[in-house]
Amino acid sequence: MTRVLLAEDEPLLREILVEGLVDEGFEVQAAVDGLEALVLYRAQRPFDALLLDEEMPGLTGRQLLRLLRGEGDRVAAVIFSGNLVLEAGEQAGLGIGPVLRKPVSMRELCAALHAAIAAAKRPPGP
């Protein structure tokens, strides 16, 4: 089963996402913010993918990824936000899969997770 760590600070949205992802066959661990996600990630790895809200208290999705990438971790990652725009260089540099704009459909979310997981399994380029 594909393990996903979800970090979303809005309780209702977090609950909806967990239920939807579980219904789609994912095993989901949920965190209320970026700091809790970091603690859960380190304690319960391996995860196949991270699904991160960009705008959270503590650590943003990008800040969390910078920490993990700095430790050499290449876990698949999808960021979603109501208003985030990333430059292609920053997105590639952090190894972020698709960046999704809220609201997002479960179909789009699942497709993004599968794409990010497949990309993370490929060997890094030169």
Segments from the language model and where they lie:
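Acidic catalytic/metal-coordinating carboxylates
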Residues: 33-36, 60-64
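Receiver (REC) domain active-site loop signature in two-component systems and cognate sites
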Residues: 56
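Charged docking surfaces used in two-component/phosphorelay signaling
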Residues: 15-23
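Active-site residues of response regulator receiver
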Residues: 53
